[in-house]
């Protein structure tokens, strides 16, 4: 019989007892609802722990999950995260940098001077295509604090387009950050979709 149980990822760092969640130990994460799920998501958000969604990381699945709710445009993803002070910023692919420069009517060199060197990574949804990346610092220089808007919104990087979804490098899944209400909504709806399509799958806490 195929084992339909998956081990939790980052969530295993969470001390359930410390947060009054000891009664959830051994529970199926995918089946949690109501106050228990709300308290767990709030706690994970406070600890900056993302949740893995056991769905293939495909454009269709990403768009499906993003459609479950709407971004509140709080702007928190555009500023430094106090729980992750070592974050280098917003990752931008080379072709995205060119689009941003064109949108701002500036040169690629000028934009490059605003960033730091990134790394070579597979392009999202195209694992055979490698691309250099750059890091935009936080707070993002294109974030307008009042009224929480973006100077490059039409050409914003893919990491901004799909936030709070995070690419993990695993084609079999992706993660969702839950330190905003939008992320919490997406997790609840994504888990409901997984339960509906794979009712035997379990992720034990």
Language-model segments: residues:
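Short loop/turn segments that flank or connect secondary-structure elements
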Residues: 1-205
